[in-house]
Regions:
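Periplasmic c-type cytochrome electron-transfer domains
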Residues: 1-195
Length: 195
C-alpha cells in the first residue's frame, strides 16, 4: 500500500477509511483538519491542481503570484521553454541519442498563455519547503492561502486562479488540513547528520 509508505496523518486517515474501520479513523484528524479536508476537495476546489499521490498535477499555471520586491515579473514556463529550445545540448539536438523521447519539448507551446506560469508544486511536507512561491515570495502558508483567497490580477499574463472567498475560520481549517500532509522522513537518523 503506497499510502503507508508516505506516513502522513492524512495518509493514515485515508488508509483507515479505506479499511472501513471508522473507529480507527475518528481520532487521526481533528474536527478542524477534517473540515479543512472537506474545503480542500469541495468549496476551495484545490484538487483541480493538487491531486494524485503527490497532490500535484505537474501542470503549469499562472496563479498571479507577485514577483519578489524589486524584481521584474518572471516569465515562468514561457521563458523556460525558449531557453531550453535554444540550448545546443537539449534533447532535440545532434548530440542526443534519443530525440524521439523528447516529444514534450518538440510540441511544447511557448505562447502567451504560458507567461508567468509555474509547475504546480507538491503539497507533501509543506513545513519543510518554506518559503513558498517559485522565488520564495511568501513566508507562510497563511500568506499563500490569503493569496488564493483573493486571487489578485497577475502582473503579467492572466491569473488562472479564482478567488476562494473563504471565511477566516475556513482558511484556518484549510491550513490545519495542509499540515496533516507532513510526514517524517523514512530514513535512519544517522544519514540525516554530518559524519
Amino acid at each position: 500500500n503506497r499510502s503507508s509508505d508516505l506516513a502522513s496523518r492524512f495518509d493514515e486517515y485515508v488508509k483507515s477509511i479505506n479499511s472501513n474501520q471508522k473507529d480507527d479513523s475518528s481520532n487521526i484528524l481533528t474536527i478542524q483538519e477534517k473540515q479543512g479536508l472537506k474545503l480542500f476537495i469541495g468549496k476551495a476546489n484545490c484538487t483541480n491542481c493538487h491531486n494524485g499521490p503527490l497532490l500535484a498535477n505537474n501542470a503549469f499555471h499562472n496563479t498571479g503570484l507577485l514577483s519578489s520586491p524589486g524584481k521584474l515579473p518572471d516569465l515562468g514556463r514561457k521563458r523556460g521553454i525558449d531557453v531550453v529550445r535554444q540550448d545546443p545540448f537539449n534533447c532535440l539536438n545532434a548530440f542526443s541519442d534519443n530525440n524521439k523521447a523528447c516529444m514534450e519539448l518538440l510540441y511544447a507551446s511557448s505562447t502567451k498563455e504560458l507567461v508567468g506560469s509555474f509547475r504546480t508544486p507538491s503539497l507533501r511536507n509543506l513545513k519543510l519547503t518554506a518559503p513558498y512561491g517559485h522565488a520564495g515570495q511568501q513566508q507562510s502558508l497563511t500568506e499563500v492561502l490569503n493569496h488564493y483567497n483573493e486571487a489578485p490580477d497577475a502582473m503579467i499574463g492572466h491569473n488562472e486562479a479564482k478567488p476562494l472567498e473563504l471565511w477566516s475560520w475556513e482558511l484556518w481549517q484549510l491550513e490545519a488540513f495542509l499540515e496533516t500532509l507532513d510526514a517524517p522522513p523514512k530514513i535512519e537518523g544517522k544519514w540525516l547528520s554530518a559524519p
